[in-house]
From Swiss-Prot:
Positions of glycan attachment: 4
E.C. code: 3.4.23.-
Species assigned in the record: Bison bonasus
Listed GO MF terms: aspartic-type endopeptidase activity
Localization: Secreted, Extracellular space
Name the record gives this protein: Pregnancy-associated glycoprotein 50I
Coiled coil: none
Gene Ontology terms: biological process: proteolysis
Comment field (misc): On the 2D-gel the determined pI of this protein is: 5.4, its MW is: 50 kDa.
Keyword Secreted: yes
Signal peptide coordinates: none
Key words of the record: Aspartyl protease, Glycoprotein, Hydrolase, Protease, Secreted
Presence of the UniProt keyword Protease in the record: yes
């Protein structure tokens, strides 16, 4: 499984 977290 893969998860992506992007905070700008």
């Amino acid at each position: 499984s893969g998860s992506n977290l992007t905070t700008v």
